[in-house]
Amino acid sequence: MYFVYILKCKDGSLYTGITTNVERRFKEHKDGKGGAYTRAKKAIKIIYSEQYKNRSKASKREAEIKKLRRAEKYALIKH
């Protein structure tokens, strides 16, 4: 299984990523072992995730979410 996830960062920004284990990946982000963005912005909370059976579908969804504006991401999270 693959997951698309959104993290909230200390400065209020949002980070979208893909993984097979959301909790492990969040810990990596918090420990400074994630992407450069979360090392700089400090991930503080998992605020959303979606599950997919394969990497291809998850990657497509990740790309869709990354194109959304901030308000659209928050609307997605609320549903």
Show where each model-derived region lies.
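GIY-YIG nuclease catalytic motif and its immediate N-terminal context
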Residues: 1-52, 56-66, 70-79
